[in-house]
C-alpha cells in the first residue's frame, strides 16, 4: 500500500516543529542540570569541551556495538564504561557505500550521538532538537564534513544551540545492508525486532530513548523534544510520527525535503 504525502501534512509537521522552539521551558524535569564539561550519566561520566557559546559532547555511546551476535539485531543498552569518557571527537561512521562527502573512519561500532547545549548551563530546562542525517539510508554520519578543505562540519549543532537556546542532538544509525536489509532468515528471530530490515530505524528510536533518560543532565527538557531531518532523515521522521512504538519519545516533528511515503 502506498501512502501519499499530503502538502497539508508536510506543512503541519513544519509548523509543529517551529512551535517546539517556542514551547514553555518552565516545567521541572526532576533531574538536576549539571554544570561544567563533565557530566555524570548512568553508564559513566563523560567530559566534553566548551566551543563558542556551547558545551559540546561528542561520540557518546547510546547502544552496545552492533557486532557479532548483535549484528542485524535490535540495538541493546550501552556497556557502562569505567572512569571518565573523553567526549571530544566524533565516533566512527557506520559502514556505508562511498559518497562525495568527507566521512570519518567507518566501523560497525558506530552507535554514538553528540550533544550541544548552551554555555553557561541554563537555569531552566531547554527544548531539545534531535537530528537524523540524510543519505538515502545508505551513507552519511554525524561527523560528515565538506572535503578538500572547502568547509567544515556539515551537521554542526553549535550555532543552532547557541543562537536559538536549545539542546541539539545528532545521532548515527546503521545504514545500507546492516541497517535496512530485509531477509526472511532474519525475520522473527529477535523479539525486539520481529520484522527484518528496520535496524536503522530501531537505532534512531534507541537514541530517542537515551535522550528521554539522559538529556535533563545537559539542561534539556525530555518532555519537549522535536525530531527533525532532511532527505532520508526526513522520511525517517515521518516513520516515527506514524509508529506507535515511537510514541512518547518526542513531541514535535520537522520533515525537511524527504517524502512521507511508504509501501
What are these regions (language model features)?
Residues 110, 193-216:
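Alpha/beta-hydrolase active-site loop
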Residues 18-21:
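C-terminal motif of bacterial Sec signal peptides marking the signal peptidase cleavage site
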Residues 234-245:
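Short glycine-enriched nucleophile-adjacent loop
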Residues 134, 199-203, 231-234:
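Active-site loop->helix "elbow" adjoining a glycine-rich segment at hydrolase catalytic centers
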Amino acid at each position: 500500500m502506498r501512502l501519499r504525502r499530503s502538502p497539508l501534512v508536510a506543512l503541519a509537521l513544519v509548523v509543529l516543529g517551529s512551535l517546539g522552539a517556542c514551547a514553555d521551558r518552565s516545567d521541572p524535569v526532576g533531574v538536576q542540570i549539571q554544570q561544567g564539561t563533565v557530566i555524570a550519566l548512568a553508564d559513566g561520566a563523560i567530559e566534553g569541551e566548551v566551543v563558542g557559546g556551547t558545551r559540546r559532547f561528542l561520540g557518546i555511546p547510546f547502544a552496545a556495538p552492533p557486532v557479532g551476535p548483535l549484528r542485524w539485531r535490535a540495538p541493546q543498552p550501552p556497556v557502562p564504561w569505567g572512569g571518565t569518557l573523553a567526549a571530544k571527537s566524533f565516533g566512527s561512521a557506520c559502514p556505508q557505500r562511498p559518497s562525495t562527502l568527507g566521512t570519518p573512519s567507518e566501523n560497525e561500532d558506530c552507535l554514538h550521538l553528540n550533544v550541544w547545549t548552551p554555555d553557561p548551563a541554563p537555569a531552566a530546562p531547554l527544548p531539545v532538537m534531535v537530528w537524523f542525517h540524510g543519505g538515502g539510508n545508505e551513507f552519511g554520519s554525524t561527523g560528515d564534513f565538506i572535503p578538500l578543505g572547502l568547509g567544515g562540519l556539515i551537521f554542526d549543532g553549535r550555532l543552532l544551540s547557541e543562537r536559538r537556546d536549545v539542546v541539539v542532538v545528532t545521532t548515527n544509525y546503521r545504514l545500507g545492508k546492516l541497517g535496512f536489509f530485509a531477509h526472511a532468515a532474519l525475520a522473527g528471530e529477535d523479539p525486539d525486532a520481529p520484522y527484518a530490515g528496520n535496524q536503522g530505524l530501531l537505532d534512531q528510536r534507541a537514541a530517542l530513548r537515551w535522550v528521554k533518560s539522559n538529556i535533563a543532565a545537559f539542561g534539556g527538557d525530555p518532555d519537549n523534544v522535536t525530531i527533525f531531518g532532511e532527505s532520508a532523515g526526513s522520511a525517517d521522521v515521518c516513520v516515527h510520527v506514524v509508529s506507535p512504538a515511537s510514541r512518547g519519545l518526542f513531541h514535535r516533528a520537522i520533515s525537511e525535503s524527504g517524502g512521507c511515503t511508504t509501501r
